[in-house]
Amino acid sequence: MFFINFKKIKKKQFPIYLTQHRIITVFLIFIYFINLKDCFHINNSRILSDVDKHRGLYYNIPKCNVCHKCSICTHENGEAQNVIPMVAIPSKRKHIQDINKEREENKYPLHIFEEKDIYNNKDNVVKKEDIYKLRKKKKQKKNCLNFLEKDTMFLSPSHDKETFHINHMNKIKDEKYKQEYEEEKEIYDNTNTSQEKNETNNEQNLNINLINNDKVTLPLQQLEDSQYVGYIQIGTPPQTIRPIFDTGSTNIWIVSTKCKDETCLKVHRYNHKLSSSFKYYEPHTNLDIMFGTGIIQGVIGVETFKIGPFEIKNQSFGLVKREKASDNKSNVFERINFEGIVGLAFPEMLSTGKSTLYENLMSSYKLQHNEFSIYIGKDSKYSALIFGGVDKNFFEGDIYMFPVVKEYYWEIHFDGLYIDHQKFCCGVNSIVYDLKKKDQENNKLFFTRKYFRKNKFKTHLRKYLLKKIKHQKKQKHSNHKKKKLNKKKNYLIFDSGTSFNSVPKDEIEYFFRVVPSKKCDDSNIDQVVSSYPNLTYVINKMPFTLTPSQYLVRKNDMCKPAFMEIEVSSEYGHAYILGNATFMRYYYTVYRRGNNNNSSYVGIAKAVHTEENEKYLSSLHNKINNL
């Protein structure tokens, strides 16, 4: 029922409508939706609900092609013109969710004579898959490993970009280096390269352009449960190299025969002297790149690259000629036998030449969709890199696209990381804030009777008062910081060159206090895993959850969260990193380049792992091996 009151204000009557509270509420909600008709809206009470269950009920998101500067949109699901599947060789390390499968296999251990049968088969051919199966069945579960340990984890160069040094040498002053430079221009001595030439001739016959239904495939292989590498060809005649495809960096690095270090000698190296299309970049430029575990030194060259059906000429890249380990740390390539890096991040990060490989590829071939996507198989064996669109077989539901905040990393804004239903960081009522406050309270000094001795009372009283004043100052400083924390934004960086997810340095201690490592063996592993919380990344109020079995790893009868400490420069905000094995394994990711003042986007969808996908990618891998 409506009531109408009239008031005389400056001799004018203004009707003021007063209604029941329910009608007012409905009216305000209606006005709110009118104002947000072109925007995304979500019921905040469902912020940590299962995204698949509530997606259709609580989301009204436009397509990206009709959306301009939206905080979120959905992918148009354009099919890819070029699909590059990645196939990984399974390693001895296993994920928590695969342990049950291993238990069944270990019930039937193989014996020595069975191992001999593998090597003495009629065709006299040794299959890597057979050897792996044999070793896996003989492996004891207590030695079951998953990914690399934190201290030996390979970090992509993106995490230490501020530490690299570029030394332009327009004039070569070092006589020793000048002599080496002149020698490299001479014709290569055939007597010392007969074996390498034979290998090159065989690789020239390798055709990795498997085109089927407008989809091009290039298998990738997994190394140490950490990195995914694929086959590319370099030079004329082509030499086959297996680099990492890294969304966390932009430069191309190839291990060359110029490198005589032990870690270089154990992998296949590119020989620039065998290629007629190779030339040095002008002006002659040396590069020193510092990683988390060492330094790579090299020189910039120009060469012809072939990735699947794409041939990119005059592409600048870095030739690795030396690897130096940091103090008390292992060498960059010591644990992982990759032969190079192909960066897929933005040009602003480039230090090897003028244009990136992806820019040259897109400008040369004019693909329908200026994007690529990554699919990581559930068991880390079968994976795929897709250029020019997406493959609907690898995901389900919509792909939710989020704008890149700064075109350097593939970096987006996100609301925060939640451990179960509590925000981890930052701001009031977050886990980090509560733990820091608790630590401050525990550090207070309290009087005890031992301090009340007559001869020491004044001294200890003075010390106590000084400590108390100092503590009060800290509290004021903490309250001042609290206001800053509320304004601090959180960011996510998508990095396919890193395996584990990361937490900033100042928060990693608190993270492991809430999600600690626990002892687990075959008798209690299910109980231990179920005791861990869910971890949820909330992006524009949309939750993307990792269950304990998805983010835990097992090593030496210990269950550990697959997280590590990586500190990103403050220039790029309060940033967390999502890696290939802990996040991308369960979520299909899309990377779209912006143009004409349109933002770049990162897309996320729930990954689908089926036997059909494995068979499809496995068949492509077998075709590559048989060529």
Curated annotation (Swiss-Prot):
TM region(s), chain numbering: 14-34
Gene Ontology molecular function: any one: aspartic-type endopeptidase activity
Listed InterPro entries: Aspartic_peptidase_A1, Pepsin-like_dom, PEPTIDASE_A1, Peptidase_aspartic_dom_sf
Coiled-coil ranges per UniProt: none
CDD domains: pepsin_like
Pfam families named in the record: Asp
Enzyme Commission number(s) from the entry: 3.4.23.-
Topology Cytoplasmic: residue spans: 1-13
Positions of the catalytic residues: 246, 495
Any single GO CC term annotated in Swiss-Prot or TrEMBL for this entry: rhoptry
Bridged cysteine pairs (disulfide): none
Keywords: Aspartyl protease, Cytoplasmic vesicle, Hydrolase, Membrane, Protease, Signal-anchor, Transmembrane, Transmembrane helix, Zymogen
Location in the cell: Membrane; Cytoplasmic vesicle, Secretory vesicle, Rhoptry
Description of post-translational modifications: Autocleaved into a p55 mature form.
Annotated knockout phenotype: Normal asexual development in host erythrocytes. Egress from erythrocytes is normal; however, subsequent erythrocyte invasion by newly released merozoites is severely impaired. Accumulation of RAP1 p86 precursor resulting from impaired processing. Impaired ASP processing. Impaired secretion of CyRPA during merozoite egress from erythrocytes.
GO biological process: entry into host cell by a symbiont-containing vacuole; protein autoprocessing; protein processing; proteolysis
Lumenal face of the membrane: 35-627
Membrane topology (UniProt): Single-pass type II membrane protein
Signal peptide: none
Impact when changing residue 246 to A: Loss of catalytic activity
Functional summary from the UniProt entry: During the asexual blood stage, initiates the proteolytic maturation of several rhoptry proteins and thus, is required for merozoite invasion of host erythrocytes and probably the subsequent development of the ring-stage. Cleaves rhoptry associated protein 1 RAP1 and apical sushi protein ASP during schizont maturation. Also cleaves rhoptry protein RON3.
Family from the record: Belongs to the peptidase A1 family.
Name of this chain's protein: Plasmepsin IX
Lineage of the species this protein comes from: Eukaryota, Sar, Alveolata, Apicomplexa, Aconoidasida
Encoding gene (name): PMIX
